[in-house]
């Protein structure tokens, strides 16, 4: 799962520096995460479904067979949406019991997760839910990792390189980090060193507008923000819910403005929500129930000032949907 330390700092810093941010509404949700008291929800590898594990509704029926020819092996966004919809009517479980006694050896990570939750996947059904997994959007870069600020590079999940389109394939983020990291390092290594020395600078503590003593403390307002984003800006989106989310984000802003983590989360939440409201279509991981089809002339969302701006793509550079994961 996404580590707890990943709290959108890169995206928030870019926003405050007025860097161009691209497609922040493109947030991928992993279909099966263990629905338990563990936080964040641990992801259950797709290899389980590859080994034959089934998704079951409350009546024990394999509902994915009614939705897609590939059943549980359908693309991530399709499976995540169906789990989301089914959970409105009752629990959804992953049945991996057919893997049998070899489960601890075959899937040691999942075994350890299940044990922490008090479950034995050899005999128990695993309660599941979608979970936020990867951000295809981020700081806009070119193919060499250059951002809109001269001299600044970005790579990894903080960047929007365009590599993943609107629906990332499994494991491609690792390849992206390796390739773009190497490209950035190679280019920076070729740059001439500065001809003048940079003087040491001391920044007074009063220059910081955050309360550093709060950086490791839990905050009820952060929990509220997480709930708002999950309920209103999650797997399935609608204009009414997105507008309500913007109001809630504004309401929570005073409580989180001086929180080192909270202010980053606020910035990211505002970017994702505003861009999701502006994209009146469904594309890849971004699904609007009030705009359920894809726009035949897609635009990227590019934000470089307080309000999202849809910038038409140049001819020959279509937004890519992605393929089954």
Can you annotate each of these PLM segments?
Residues 109-153:
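FAD/FMN-dependent oxidoreductases across multiple families
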Residues 4-8, 77, 104, 145-146, ...:
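Conserved structured core elements
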Residues 2-15, 21:
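Thiamine diphosphate
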Residues 13, 19-126, 187-193:
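An anion/pyrophosphate-binding glycine-rich loop and adjacent beta-alpha core
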Residues 1-5, 39-43, 47, 168-175:
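Alpha-helix capping and helix-loop boundary segments enriched in small/acidic/polar residues
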Residues 8, 48-51, 134:
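Short, solvent-exposed loop/turn segments at the edges of secondary structure
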Residues 56, 61-64, 72, 82-83, ...:
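Glycine- and aromatic-enriched mobile tails/lids
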């Amino acid at each position: 799962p996404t580590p707890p330390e990943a709290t959108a700092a890169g995206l928030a810093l870019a926003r405050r520096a007025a860097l161009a941010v691209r497609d922040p509404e493109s947030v991928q949700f992993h279909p099966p995460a263990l629905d338990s008291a563990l936080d964040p929800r641990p992801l259950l590898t797709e290899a389980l479904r590859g080994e034959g594990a089934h998704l079951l509704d409350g009546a024990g029926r394999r509902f994915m067979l009614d939705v897609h020819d590939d059943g549980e092996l359908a693309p991530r966004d399709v499976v995540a949406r169906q789990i989301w919809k089914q959970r409105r009517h009752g629990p959804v479980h992953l049945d991996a019991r057919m893997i049998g006694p070899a489960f601890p050896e075959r899937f040691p990570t999942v075994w350890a997760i299940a044990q922490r939750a008090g479950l034995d996947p050899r005999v128990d059904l695993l309660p599941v839910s979608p979970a936020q997994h990867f951000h295809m959007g981020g700081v806009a870069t070119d193919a060499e990792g250059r951002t809109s600020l001269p001299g600044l590079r970005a790579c990894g999940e903080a960047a929007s390189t365009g590599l993943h389109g609107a629906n990332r394939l499994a494991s491609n983020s690792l390849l992206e980090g390796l390739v773009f990291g190497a490209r950035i390092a190679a280019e920076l290594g070729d740059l001439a060193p500065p001809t003048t020395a940079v003087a040491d600078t001391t920044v007074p503590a009063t220059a910081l507008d955050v309360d550093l003593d709060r950086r490791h403390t839990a905050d009820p307002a952060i929990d509220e923000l997480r709930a708002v984003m999950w309920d209103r800006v999650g797997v399935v989106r609608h204009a009414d819910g997105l507008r309500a989310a913007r109001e809630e984000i504004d309401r929570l802003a005073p409580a989180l403005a001086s929180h080192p983590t909270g202010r980053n989360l606020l910035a990211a939440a505002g970017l994702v929500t505003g861009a999701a409201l502006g994209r009146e279509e469904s594309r890849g991981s971004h699904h609007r129930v009030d705009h359920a089809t894809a726009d035949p002339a897609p635009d990227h969302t590019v934000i470089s000032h307080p309000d999202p701006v849809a910038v038409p793509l140049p001819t020959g550079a279509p937004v890519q949907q992605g393929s089954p994961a």
